[in-house]
């Protein structure tokens, strides 16, 4: 904001000396962010002054003490200066914070003042509306009851009727209540009351909110913090002299010699330092430290106070915006009140319908009668033409072969009368109005309807214009007005004309009385100056012939003179001649007296006219001054109101600008977030693609692992079945061995029982040991082989054990372990076969009777050992078989889990594939939208020399104008290919990878950074251009308003157009009474005379142009059409009769303009003297310089105006206008007075005809200069009239 509490504008930013910035994060009511704390100033540390003295009698010790004190004082002074600087900065910041809060409060005051003004306007409107509503709520029942008492006809079906039928519905007449739904009105009463209460409550809420805002603002104004700040300037000025004193004392001590007196002085000086100077410096430093702490506290307090005040201001402004929005949207609409108002308006509406029915019925009748009359007249014309054609054809039938005697005719038809309104008479309207007048509640409606009823007889504008048969002497207008003008219209028009003539008569009578009064007052000027003048010169006119009595006396004397002498005869003759001379002299004297009386009367009239003109001009100027002063006061009030409105609009514009800036900032942030999201989406898409590839690889590896697991499970099942078979074979072998040892015995079920039974049988075989000695060697050899086999079996067992352990760790070695087990089983089978063979051999030997108990025992022990080993091997083999089964079961479960996981992974991959497709489509769509946005902004994205470039479309078109340039520069469109969306539909992984890489490459081709830079640059260019255009538009608008306001009240003198203010003056052509616009180089702008102008009583007319018609004179039409009747000037009331093609008698081919104008300031006083004729007084002024001697004070105004008018006529008159037409319509008295002067001027003009051509040219130049001078004078008079005295 500025220091005046106004929002800073970009246009005036360079002219502002200081501005105040506010952070919304801290001043907003919703945000509770902590204020950033500034670093605290370094505190002022105070040290004790040095007071250590090693030797009181040593001068150097004293010098060292003084040096230490000087250093301490200098450091203390420096720290105090830094503290003073900190105090100044803190005080300055405190003042800025306080001023910022005051500026914000001033801005709030402006807004609150505007709000109060708007609320006062809204409150006034609401009070008026509430008053109307209250009146309607109080009177609607009575108005509804009045409707029931007012009779009305039921024929108007288009008026609103109730939804339910009523009694006596078949009657033709009823009441106005029949046109109102009483039930709905009864329901609308409570609803309207409730709506009015709600509206009143809404107004009260707004008033309460405005009051709270005003009270809050007033509290802020009352709670203004104290802005007084303390400085340490005086303290710093006190401590500096003390520091300089210590320094000067140190320098003084350095220059002293070492003696007892010097030491005493030094000691005394040091004591002064210790007691006075050093404590004073410490006290001042402590005060400065306290001032620094106080400045810090004051700054903190001011910051907190300003923060709280700005938050309150922000809260008030937010509420103020809401209240302003509520006031702006404050409206009231209620159907219930509309129903109630219809009850009040129904009498007036019904009366208007009655009047409209009469008007339409009369118009229809008039149209029918006029159409019949028109058809009859046209048929008469057609019959006459038909007879003329027949007659002509009959005369020319010998030379022609024309047989068509038909004459074109016109058929008149009426249309648009499908809907007939009910027939209403004027008597019905008068009766209805009387009914309303008798009802006390409808008097106003009756008065309005009575006025509307009177307007039925008022003629329309066209009828008033057609009522005048001769409009500027045109017979064509008479023919037009004769049609569609019947007796009723004639009566009305004649009545209007009668009223106008009566008004004119009253005006003429008042003017005549005024002239008689002037003549009576100035009649003494016409009497002779001497009382005996009439004795010498009788009043009766003298005649050159003597009267009959004198003639008879002279005859009788001549008869008697015959007796007289010659001398007497001579005397008689002399007397006769003297009488004749006396008669001639008397006639001459009487003529001179009449001329003097006429000249005196003329001068008197001129003086009266001049005085009247002056009084009229003075009155006109005073009236204009009053009007101008009133208008000036009104305009000043309007200017103030508009200034307030402009400030409000500027504030509103600033708020809108701020909101737009915030929206722009939010949009930038959203764009940045979208860019980040797009980048994240790209990254997620890449990660998803990598995950998808990894998942595909994992699926492939899982599939391979599953296949391997299945194969291994098959192998394990095979191993388990083989082991089971091996166990069965071992069981069968042991059973066979038992059966061999005991052929008739029963074989036990378990292997251990079999082994025990074999042991028992082996003990029985010891009896036959002696028989087996011969076979001992063989048995020993067999024993050795069996031991070797057992060792092999043990080694095989260990190998199998290690193989099983490796099988648990590595599944790949399962097949080898199974093969080893198979080899072991084969070895055991071979061993069992060998044992079986040996047992058979022993049985055969026993059967043969061989003995050898010892060898047999050994052999049996060996066999038992073998059997134990074999049983252990079998137990181990069974354990391995069980473990193998368990492992097989675990691997089966693992295989099932892998298959389930495989299915889940497949389903998840399918879902992710669909999501990837949707993501790819969305990315593709976003890229297309961004490219389309660039195209709409006028950009084109192209690839040029391997780089992405955003250019204007015009540049790209210019670049692609020729194929050679396109091929050389490498400009290629970057629009993505839609077929790349199917990258996941590849038949092979390599093809899918290639498509995916192409898709990523197409996406990477569109750079978001370049897009953002282009859009931001484009937006900035648009903003700059918009600001420029807005500034220019404001300038042009202000210039237009200024020029319009200046030109509205100025008189135009060239380039006339509609709406201009023009000064119209009469031309010299008195025969046609033409008026033209005052102009400079723009002639032939003539005024269309209207009755309201009253040009007969005016010398000038100030009017505003409403219409301009451009015309060209074409005399060929008038010559071909025949010469119209020309009436004499004395016979025609409006001057000579003229033709519409050339009403002002201009030359052929001349372009002229006919202006319609309305008087700008009607009611200007008329001038009685100059209003009669504007040319004759000009002639009097022009010729009066020859014979008459006028006083300069009596006729300055009239002379100036007449000279201006004369120059205006000379400048505006066309070359084709006839200047020789004598002014026939002039004031009779003025014309009589001017005739002698005209005769004398004609004689003088005849005498001056012999002047040279150079003299006439000089006179022409003088006339031009005089015309220019009069134009300047007239401009000054006009400017004085406009500005006021």
Swiss-Prot record:
* Record's bilayer topology term: Peripheral membrane protein
What the entry lists under Pfam families is as follows: ATG11, ATG17_like
Subunit structure, interactors included:
Homodimer.
> Which Gene Ontology cellular component terms are annotated?
Atg1/ULK1 kinase complex; phagophore assembly site membrane; vacuolar membrane
Predominant location category: membrane
Q: Where is the composition biased (Basic and acidic residues)?
A: 1275-1285
Q: How is this protein named in the record?
A: Autophagy-related protein 11
Listed InterPro entries: ATG11 (IPR040040), Atg11_C (IPR019460), ATG17-like_dom (IPR045326)
**GO terms for MF:** molecular adaptor activity; protein kinase binding
Per the record, where are the segments of Low complexity compositional bias?
551-562
Positions in coiled-coil regions: 73-150, 486-523, 563-726, 769-937
UniProt keyword Transport present: yes
Q: Does the keyword Coiled coil apply?
A: yes
Q: Where is this region: Disordered?
A: 32-52, 523-568, 595-615, 1116-1142, 1181-1285
Q: What is the lineage of its organism?
A: Eukaryota, Fungi, Dikarya, Ascomycota, Pezizomycotina
- Family of the protein in this entry: Belongs to the ATG11 family.
Role played = Involved in cytoplasm to vacuole transport (Cvt), pexophagy, mitophagy and nucleophagy. Recruits mitochondria for their selective degradation via autophagy (mitophagy) during starvation. Works as scaffold proteins that recruit ATG proteins to the pre-autophagosome (PAS), the site of vesicle/autophagosome formation. Required for the Cvt vesicles completion.
Q: What residue spans carry the Polar residues bias annotation?
A: 601-615, 1197-1215
Q: Which key words tag this protein in UniProt?
A: Autophagy, Coiled coil, Membrane, Protein transport, Transport, Vacuole
Q: Where in the cell is it found?
A: Preautophagosomal structure membrane; Vacuole membrane
Mind listing the GO biological process terms from this record? autophagosome assembly; autophagy of mitochondrion; pexophagy; piecemeal microautophagy of the nucleus; protein transport; reticulophagy; ribophagy
């Amino acid at each position: 904001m500025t220091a005046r509490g106004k929002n800073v504008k970009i246009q005036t930013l360079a002219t502002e000396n200081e501005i105040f910035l506010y952070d919304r994060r801290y001043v907003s009511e919703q945000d509770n962010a902590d204020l950033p704390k500034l670093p605290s100033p370094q505190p002022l540390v105070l040290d004790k002054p040095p007071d250590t003295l090693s030797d009181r009698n040593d001068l150097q010790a004293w010098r060292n003490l003084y040096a230490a004190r000087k250093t301490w004082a200098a450091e203390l002074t420096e720290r105090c200066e830094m503290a003073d600087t900190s105090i100044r900065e803190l005080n300055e910041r405190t003042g800025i914070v306080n001023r910022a809060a005051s500026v914000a409060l001033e801005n709030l005051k402006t807004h609150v003042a505007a709000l109060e003004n708007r609320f006062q306007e809204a409150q006034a409107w609401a009070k008026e509306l509430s008053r109307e509503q209250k009146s309607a709520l109080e009177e609607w029942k009575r108005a509804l009851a009045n409707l029931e008492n007012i009779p009305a006809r039921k024929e108007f079906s288009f008026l609103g009727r109730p939804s339910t039928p009523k009694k006596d519905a078949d009657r033709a007449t009823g009441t106005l209540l029949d046109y109102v739904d009483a039930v709905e009105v009864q329901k609308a009463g409570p609803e309207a009351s409730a709506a009015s209460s709600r509206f009143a409550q809404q107004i009260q809420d707004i008033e309460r909110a405005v009051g709270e805002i005003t009270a809050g603002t007033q509290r802020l104004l009352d709670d203004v913090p104290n802005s007084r700040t303390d400085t340490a300037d005086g303290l710093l000025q006190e401590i500096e002299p003390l520091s300089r004193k210590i320094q000067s004392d140190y320098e003084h001590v350095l220059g002293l010699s070492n003696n007892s007196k010097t030491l005493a002085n030094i000691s005394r000086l040091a004591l002064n330092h210790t007691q006075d100077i050093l404590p004073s410096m410490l006290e001042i430093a402590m005060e400065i430290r306290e001032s620094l702490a106080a400045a810090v506290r004051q700054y903190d307090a001011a910051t907190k106070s300003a923060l709280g005040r700005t938050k309150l201001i922000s809260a008030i402004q937010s509420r103020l915006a809401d209240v302003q929005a509520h006031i702006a949207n404050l409206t009231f609409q209620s159907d219930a009140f509309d129903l109630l108002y219809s009850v009040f308006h129904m009498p007036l509406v019904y009366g208007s319908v009655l009047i409209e029915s009469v008007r339409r019925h009369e118009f229809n009748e008039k149209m029918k009668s006029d159409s019949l009359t028109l058809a009859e007249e046209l048929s008469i014309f057609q019959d006459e033409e038909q007879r003329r054609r027949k007659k002509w054809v009959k005369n020319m039938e010998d030379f022609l072969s024309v047989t068509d005697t038909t004459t074109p005719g016109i058929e008149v038809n009426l249309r648009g009368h499908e809907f007939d309104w009910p027939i209403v008479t004027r008597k019905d309207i008068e009766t209805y109005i009387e009914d309303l007048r008798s009802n006390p509640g409808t008097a106003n409606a009756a008065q309005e309807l009575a006025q509307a009823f009177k307007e039925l007889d008022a003629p329309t504008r066209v009828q008033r214009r057609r009522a005048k048969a001769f409009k500027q002497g045109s017979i064509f207008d008479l023919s037009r007005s004769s049609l569609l003008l019947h007796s009723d219209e004639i009566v009305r028009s004649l009545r209007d004309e009668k009223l106008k003539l009566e008004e004119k008569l009253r005006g003429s009578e008042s003017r005549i009385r005024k002239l008689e009064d002037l003549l009576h007052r100035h009649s003494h000027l016409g009497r002779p100056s001497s009382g005996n003048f009439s004795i010498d010169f009788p009043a009766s006119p003298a005649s050159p012939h003597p009267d009959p009595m004198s003639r008879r006396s002279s005859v009788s004397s001549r008869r008697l003179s015959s007796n007289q002498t010659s001398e007497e005869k001579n005397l008689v003759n002399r007397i006769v001649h003297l009488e004749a001379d006396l008669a001639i002299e008397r006639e001459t004297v009487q003529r001179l007296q009449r001329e003097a009386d006429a000249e005196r009367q003329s001068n008197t009239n001129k003086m009266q006219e001049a005085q009247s003109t002056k009084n009229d001009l003075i009155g006109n100027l005073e009236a204009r001054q009053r009007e101008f002063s009133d208008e000036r006061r009104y305009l000043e009030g309007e200017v103030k109101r508009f200034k307030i409105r402009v400030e409000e609009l500027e504030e509103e514009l600033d708020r809108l600008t701020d909101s737009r800036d915030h929206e722009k900032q939010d949009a930038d942030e959203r764009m940045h977030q979208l860019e980040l999201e797009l980048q994240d989406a790209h990254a997620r898409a890449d990660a998803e693609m990598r995950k998808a590839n990894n998942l595909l690889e994992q699926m492939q590896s899982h599939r391979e692992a599953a296949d391997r697991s299945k194969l291994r499970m098959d192998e394990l099942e095979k191993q388990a079945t083989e082991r089971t078979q091996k166990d069965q074979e071992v069981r069968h072998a042991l059973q066979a061995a038992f059966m061999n040892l005991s052929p008739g015995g029963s074989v036990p079920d378990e292997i251990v029982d079999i082994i025990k039974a074999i042991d028992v049988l082996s003990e029985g075989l010891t009896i036959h040991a002696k028989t087996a000695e011969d076979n001992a060697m063989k048995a020993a050899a067999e024993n050795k082989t069996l031991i070797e086999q057992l060792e092999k079996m043990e080694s095989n067992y260990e190998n199998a054990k290690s193989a099983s352990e490796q099988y648990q760790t590595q599944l790949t070695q399962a097949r080898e372990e199974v093969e080893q087990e198979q080899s072991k089983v084969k070895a055991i089978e071979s061993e069992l076969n060998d044992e079986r063979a040996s047992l058979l051999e022993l049985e055969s030997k026993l059967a043969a009777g061989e003995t050898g108990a010892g060898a047999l025992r050994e052999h049996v022990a060996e066999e038992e050992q073998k059997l134990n080993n074999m049983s252990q091997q079998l137990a181990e083999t069974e354990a391995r078989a069980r473990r193998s089964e368990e492992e097989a079961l675990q691997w089966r479960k693992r295989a099932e889990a892998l298959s389930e996981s495989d299915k889940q992974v497949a389903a998840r991959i399918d879902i992710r594939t669909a999501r990837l497709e949707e993501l790819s489509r969305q990315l593709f769509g976003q890229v297309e939208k961004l490219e389309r946005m660039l195209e709409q902004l006028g950009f084109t994205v192209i690839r040029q020399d391997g780089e992405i470039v955003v250019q204007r479309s015009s540049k790209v078109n210019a670049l692609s104008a020729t194929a050679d340039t396109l091929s050389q520069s490498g400009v290629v469109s970057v629009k993505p290919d839609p077929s790349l969306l199917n990258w996941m539909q590849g038949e092979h992984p390599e093809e899918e990878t290639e498509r995916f890489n192409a898709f990523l490459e197409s996406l990477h081709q569109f750079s978001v950074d370049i897009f953002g830079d282009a859009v931001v640059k484009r937006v900035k260019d648009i903003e700059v251009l918009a600001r420029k255009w807005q500034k220019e538009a404001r300038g042009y608008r202000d210039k237009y308003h200024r020029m319009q306001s200046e030109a509205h009240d100025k008189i135009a003198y060239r380039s006339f157009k509609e709406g201009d203010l023009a000064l119209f003056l009469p031309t010299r052509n008195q025969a046609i009474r033409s008026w033209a616009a005052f102009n400079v180089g723009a002639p032939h702008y003539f005024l269309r005379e209207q009755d309201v102008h009253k040009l007969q009583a005016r010398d000038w007319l100030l009017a505003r142009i409403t219409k301009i018609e451009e015309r060209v004179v074409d005399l060929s039409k008038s010559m071909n059409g025949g010469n119209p009747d020309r009436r004499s000037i004395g016979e025609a009331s409006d001057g000579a009769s003229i033709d519409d093609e050339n009403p002002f008698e201009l030359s052929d081919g001349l372009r002229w303009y006919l202006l319609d104008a309305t008087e700008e300031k009607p009611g200007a006083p008329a001038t009685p003297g100059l209003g009669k004729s504007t040319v004759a007084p000009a002639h009097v002024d022009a010729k009066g310089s020859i014979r008459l001697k006028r006083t300069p004070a009596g006729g300055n105004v009239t002379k100036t105006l007449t000279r201006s008018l004369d120059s205006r006529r000379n400048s505006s008159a066309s070359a084709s206008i006839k200047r020789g037409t004598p002014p026939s319509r002039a004031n009779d008295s003025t014309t009589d007075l001017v005739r002698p002067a005209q005769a004398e001027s004609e004689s003088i003009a005849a005498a001056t005809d012999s002047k040279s051509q150079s003299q006439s040219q000089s006179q022409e130049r003088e006339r031009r200069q005089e015309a220019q001078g009069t134009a300047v004078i007239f401009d000054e008079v006009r400017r004085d009239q406009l500005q006021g005295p």
